[in-house]
């Protein structure tokens, strides 16, 4: 008798299931963290918040602060508008010592003339990072990769 060689339907289904499981699970372990697009969007959100705080200080002729909470991954402008950032985002803020609230919270303050306390917010995920700089003299906000 001549038997046909090949795979059974069950064997093929098992292989397909294993491939599907690998397709779903492997990217989580290889690419954990924030995507490049989310990282860039987060840096732009922070920059926009800083620019909004500066504009508010100039328009209202009152000091305005943007406060970052590195633990909760949020920032607020004068304690009113809270914006949430991705959980896996790594954040670091360098600012004037007078603006440090505690270990996880600090602010960048803008003055009515447009100047600020200055600082740098670094948002990162793994090796990728963006730096949002605030010039203390002019209050100008820039993003660098």
Q: PLM features: what roles do these ranges have?
A:
Residues 1-7:
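N-terminal leader/signal peptides at the extreme start of proteins
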Residues 2, 13, 21, 25-51, ...:
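N-terminal helix-rich module
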Residues 10:
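Residues within the helices of the helix-turn-helix
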């Amino acid at each position: 008798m001549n038997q046909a060689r090949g795979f059974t339907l069950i064997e093929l289904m098992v292989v397909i299931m294993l491939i599907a499981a690998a397709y779903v699970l492997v990217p989580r372990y290889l690419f954990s963290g924030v995507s490049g697009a989310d990282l860039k969007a987060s840096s732009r959100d922070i920059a926009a918040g800083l620019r909004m705080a500066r504009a508010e200080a100039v328009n209202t002729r009152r000091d305005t602060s943007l406060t970052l909470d590195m633990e909760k991954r949020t920032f607020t402008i004068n304690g009113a508008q809270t914006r949430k950032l991705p959980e896996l985002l790594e954040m670091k803020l360098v600012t004037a010592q007078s603006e440090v609230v505690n270990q996880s919270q600090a602010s960048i303050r803008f003055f009515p003339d447009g100047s600020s306390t200055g600082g740098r917010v670094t948002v990162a995920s793994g090796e990728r990072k963006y730096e949002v700089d605030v010039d203390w003299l002019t209050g100008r906000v820039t993003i660098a990769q």
